[in-house]
């Protein structure tokens, strides 16, 4: 007689992870526009708990190059496709379509991300760069943050995208080094991700870089501290901490729900290490709105200072 092995039950979600249903006038307006323009946002795809808050504040995250990724990270709910078989072709007019649509939405801060496209010769770097340039051309005042793949560590592809002049260049380390092989796709390496952020800083030391760490996957405090140290060593300016939540039964289970107090502790530690800004909380995600408000203030201040310096230089010349 065979034994029946019972499945381990999921750890129940604590009260601090419960959120209200999305609502609000700006949320309704943006949702309607997205439907009309047939645009996909990560906010909707990932069922982000901050969607209502971000949309109400004029912020949204858009995903380029389709809805099928060539990677299969065990925490992510985006569809996975086989690069050898081939994925749906990328729409060559997507940069113009996305840029025009964003210009109609009256956003203050936009985040552009993409699936991994290992099936493309340049892994989508030029398509991504064209999108950023087109958005900037249509609305020079809009703050553009990009959240990028690792481009398999190819420095030339990273630099090509950075040369499009996004205001913030984000690439997520996701988890600590020990857990990376079991959490991320085998092609996604911990040191490779650090290399992406380092390449951006080497290309332009003034470009803001950003990364994100999920907690609750079984990491230790010592490992998280080491990850923060590694990020600072490559000049990363901004870091966010959020609780990992299991999307489906097929994905990695939550090992631990981190308390709000512990998230606050990590914020204090990261700030002490010299990060320009830290967003840390159970519901915080890579592009959390609170961080965007902070970055918006810094970027606008720098933009205001640049014309002033140019004017001073002009006066000296004349």
Positions of PLM-derived features:
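Short cysteine clusters
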Residues: 48, 69, 73-76
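Auxiliary Fe-S-binding modules of radical SAM enzymes
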Residues: 1-61, 65, 97-100, 106, ...
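Short functional micro-motifs and their immediate structural scaffolds
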Residues: 53-56, 74, 78-81
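Glycine/Thr-rich phosphate-binding loops of Rossmann-like dinucleotide-binding domains
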Residues: 72, 120, 179, 249, ...
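Core AdoMet radical
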Residues: 77-97, 102-155, 161-197, 210, ...
